[in-house]
Amino acid sequence: MKRLKRHLQVVFLTVLVFLTTSIRAQEATPRQLQEMDSVEIGLLTCSPGKEIYSLYGHTAIRVHDAATGQDVAVNYGLFNYHTPHFIPRFVFGLCDYEMGIYPFELFMEEYTEEGRGVIEQRINLTRQEKLDIINALTFNARPKNKVYHYNFFYDNCSSRARDMIVDHIHGHVGYRVNASVTSSYRVMVHQWDEQHPWDCFGCDLLLGVNADRKTTLRQQQFLPDSLRASFATAKVFREHQPPVNLVDSTWTALEAQAPETDSSFFDVFTPRVAISILTLLVVLASVSEYHKKKIYWGIDLALLLVDGLAGLVLFLMIFSKHPTVSLNLQILLLNPLSLVGLYSVIKKSRRGQYSKWLTMFAVCILLFFIGNFLQDYASGMNILALCLLDRCIVNYVVRFKDNNVLTR
C-alpha cells in the first residue's frame, strides 16, 4: 500500500545492522534473552492517504531497542509504482510486493509529509517471543524471502504483520467476536472509499459475487484499522499462566492532519450523476425516434461499443488471481458480446431492420436485474441497465411498428 522507499543506501545499512543483531541473538544465551527486556515490538496502524493505494490505511511493525538505540520499521507494503504494466498486474493479481526494514525516523518523516496519523500498539511479549519474532524478521528480510505475491484481501501488509506477531506467540490469541456484527468485503471497503465516488465505483465494478459474502473476523483483518481494533481487545492465553492483554499499551505516534474540505468537480459529478444524465439524454432521443419512426443508429453504435469494451475488461477479470472478481454478474450488462453483435445491429438498423441480437441483449439485461438478489452492483449500474434496455425496446417498437416484420 505504499510507494517504494527512498534512501536505499540508508535502508541497506539499517538491514545490515538489524541482521547482525538478529544473527547474534539466534545463539541465545540467558544474557541475550535478558537483553530482550529493552526491546519493544509494536504494531503500527497508519491512517488513510489521498492516493488510491493508500485509501485503506497501512500496517507496519516497529522494533525498538532502548538499550542500543536501534529503532526500525518493518514494512510489508513496498512496491514500485513505476514498474512496467503495474496497474494491469495489480488488477489481475500478479503484483509482487516486498518487505523492507528501515529507520523508524524515515517512516515517520513520510507520514508527516503526507499528513497521515500513526498509532502504535505495543505488544505484550515474553523475552523468547521477542527473540523469535526478530529472528523470523531476519529470515524474512533475506533477498530470496522478502518478495511475496500480493493479494488485497488475503495477503497484504496487515495480514503479514499480524501473522508475524501472532504466529510467534507461545500460546493462543483469542479475539473478542461480536456475533451480531457481520460484514462483507465490499461493505468493509466502502467504509474507506465511499468519500471517493469514482474510486468506489471502479472498485465495485471489478468486485463480484464473492465480495458480498459474510466474512470471518480473521478475514476482516485485511484492513489495517480492523486489525488494530481486533488487537485492542485480544487476549493471550499461555499455558499455566493467566490470560493477558495482547496489547500492553497504545499511543498516538503521529496525529493525522485534518483533511482538506475543498470538494472537486468529480465529488459532485459522481458516476450515478453521469449515468443518470446519459440515461435522460438517451430516453429523450428514444422519444424522438418513436415519433419520427426513425432510429438514430449512431447512439446504438456508441453505446454498444463502450459497453462491449467494458465487458471485455470484466471478461478478462475471470482470469484474475484475485478470488473476489472472477464471478461478476455485471458482465450481463457490460457484455463483451456487444462487440460481436455490433456489426449486425448497426447494419440492420441502417437498412431499417431489427436485429435479434438486441433481443439477446434485452434478455441479458433482465438477468442482470435478477442478479441484484445475489450481488451488490456499482453505483448507477441499474440506471445504466434501464438506459440500454430502453435502446432494445425502442428499436423493437419502431422497427416493428414501421415494417411490421422482424428480420435476422
Locations of regions flagged by a protein language model:
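Second-shell loop/turn segments in exported
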Residues: 49-50, 116-124, 143-152
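Residues embedded in well-ordered secondary-structure elements
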Residues: 14, 32, 49-52
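A eukaryotic "domain-start" boundary segment
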Residues: 27-40
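Bacterial Sec-dependent N-terminal signal peptides
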Residues: 1-28, 404-408
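Short, charged, amphipathic alpha-helices and their helix-cap/turn boundaries
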Residues: 128-137
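Glycine-rich catalytic cores of cysteine/serine-nucleophile enzymes that process amide/ester linkages
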Residues: 37-115
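Activation targets extended, charge/polar-rich intrinsically disordered C-terminal tails
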Residues: 139-354, 361-408
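Extracellular structured ligand-interaction cores
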Residues: 58, 71, 120-122, 158, ...
